[in-house]
Structure formats: structure tokens, C-alpha cells
Amino acid sequence: MIATIRVVVTGAAGRMGREMTRGLLQTEDIAVVGAVDRREVGVDIGSLNGLPPAGVIIQEDLAGVIASARPEVMVDFTVAAAALANARLAVEQGVSPVIGTTGISLERLDELHQLCEARQVGAVVAPNFSLGAILMMHFAEEAARYFPRAEIIEIHHDQKIDAPSGTALKTAELMAARVNRPLTPSPAEEKVAGARGATYQGLAVHSVRLPGAVAHQEVIFGGQGQLLTIRHDTTSREAFLPGLLLAIKKVRQLKGVVYGLENLLEF
């Protein structure tokens, strides 16, 4: 008999929250036992997602949901400040957070890691749950060893509130750590402020926000007489479900915070 993992979703009425909840409700070994959001309060989470009623209504009080529903894992798709508050509350109750929210600083992640270790609870924080995007970051990390310069262009829908994306920042961090030396952008005089994008870990990072986009990123490497472009396109949020399921199924085996889905994969 397959063991069922009890999950509460925070940010359940948002774009990502709804898409992931729909997938979780249709996954055999996952039981969505709670849903938290300030929107759509009192609405059945199944009905909200075009599925048969699930018997789980959206509530505002995470502490109350944890106490009554007894989840093992909390999946969070809110915003950075709320995600951290939710994660701290969950960890204190022995519930393992899986956080897909971006914009959380490394300092705050370290604080969460210390709390998780003290409570002997695992957590996963992943800027991107798409397995294809994780492979894109891995390939970029390896390519950074062989090219003197690179730039990142990330494209997202116009409702995304943070820039650069967590995926772009994570990619830059991986590349800089892989080469173990400062990366330097090409020198250029900006005739218009910001024309060369933001600089992070020595890489120029360009953020595009347009209607019609979902999540896209390319890393362009330049060397003598050649360019290498590594690109990943997410055309539907369904792409995030397999990675999310992987994190949910592994997080209870961890102690402390694992940052990045790539650390749950075998390369």
C-alpha cells in the first residue's frame, strides 16, 4: 500500500498555488488536507480548480489548519515575507516546508536553516521546480568554466513582482561558485542608466516582464569567435509539478534547509 503524504498549501488561491494544488489533488500518494490564502476564503479547493469538491476549504489561519489537519508538509507559493513567517510556524510544529516563493535573501535562509536544524526538521527552498530549468542551470554552471564572459536574460509574465527572478540569481550563484573566481561583465558606457541590466555575482542580468510569457531564461556565453546559448522555456505551469512532487517526497528525510532542487537530483 502506498503511503500518503499529508500536505497543506499556502498561497493556494494564487496562480502557482492553484496550478500546483490541482496537480496535487490528482496525485495518488498525496492528500491535500489544508489550503490557506486571504483570497477565496470558504471556497472548496477542488471546486476552485475545476475538480470535484475535495472537502477542503480555503482558510486564513495557518496555525489553525496545522492544528486541525495535521499535515506533514507545507507547500508555500506566497511572497517572501509571508513564506518565511509560514515556514517558521510550520517548523515549530514539526511540519516540513517546501517553498517555491522567490525573493528570500540568503541571510533569511540561513536563519530558517538554523531553526530547522534545532527542530530536526527538513525544508526545501527552490527558486524553480522545473526539472528542465534545473538542468539548464547545471549546464550553465559547467559552461562557465570554459567561457570568459556570460550574461543572463530572464523573461516572465507581467504579474511577477520580483526581478531578477530567483532562477536567474541562483544561476549566477552557481556559475560564480563553479569557476571560483570573480566574474566580470564586459565594460561599456551606459548612455541610458540601466541599459546593461543589473549586475549580480559579476554577471549582467536582464529582466523582461511581458504578458503572454510564463517563465523563460537564457544564458549567453561569449568566447573568442563563438557564442553559446543555453535556453529553457516553460510554456505551462504544469512543468513545475514533477519537481514539486520530488521535493515533497524527499523533504521529510532531510534535516535543515536544502536550497535548490538540483541538490535533490543526481548528476
Swiss-Prot record:
Record EC number: 1.17.1.8
UniProt superkingdom: Bacteria
CDD domains named in the record: DHDPR_N (cd02274)
Residues that bind (S)-2,3,4,5-tetrahydrodipicolinate: H157, G166, T167
Catalytic reaction(s) noted: (S)-2,3,4,5-tetrahydrodipicolinate + NAD(+) + H2O = (2S,4S)-4-hydroxy-2,3,4,5-tetrahydrodipicolinate + NADH + H(+); (S)-2,3,4,5-tetrahydrodipicolinate + NADP(+) + H2O = (2S,4S)-4-hydroxy-2,3,4,5-tetrahydrodipicolinate + NADPH + H(+)
Principal cellular location given in the protein's record: cytoplasm
Gene3D superfamilies per record: Dihydrodipicolinate Reductase, domain 2, NAD(P)-binding Rossmann-like Domain
Residues annotated as binding NAD(+): G11, A12, A13, G14, R15, M16, G100, T101, T102, A126, P127, N128, F129
Keywords on record: Amino-acid biosynthesis, Cytoplasm, Diaminopimelate biosynthesis, Lysine biosynthesis, NAD, NADP, Oxidoreductase
Chain segments annotated as transmembrane: none
Binding site for NADP(+): R39
BP terms from Gene Ontology: diaminopimelate biosynthetic process; lysine biosynthetic process via diaminopimelate
Pathway connected to this protein: Amino-acid biosynthesis; L-lysine biosynthesis via DAP pathway; (S)-tetrahydrodipicolinate from L-aspartate: step 4/4
Record-annotated disulphide pairs: none
Gene Ontology cellular component terms for the protein in this record: cytosol
List of catalytic residues: H156, K160
Compartments where found: Cytoplasm
GO MF: 4-hydroxy-tetrahydrodipicolinate reductase; NAD binding; NADP binding; oxidoreductase activity, acting on CH or CH2 groups, NAD or NADP as acceptor
HAMAP family per the UniProt record, alphabetical: DapB
PANTHER family hit by this protein: 4-HYDROXY-TETRAHYDRODIPICOLINATE REDUCTASE 1, CHLOROPLASTIC-RELATED (PTHR20836:SF0), DIHYDRODIPICOLINATE REDUCTASE (PTHR20836)
Function text: Catalyzes the conversion of 4-hydroxy-tetrahydrodipicolinate (HTPA) to tetrahydrodipicolinate.
Family as reported in the entry's similarity comment: Belongs to the DapB family.
Protein name per its UniProtKB record: 4-hydroxy-tetrahydrodipicolinate reductase
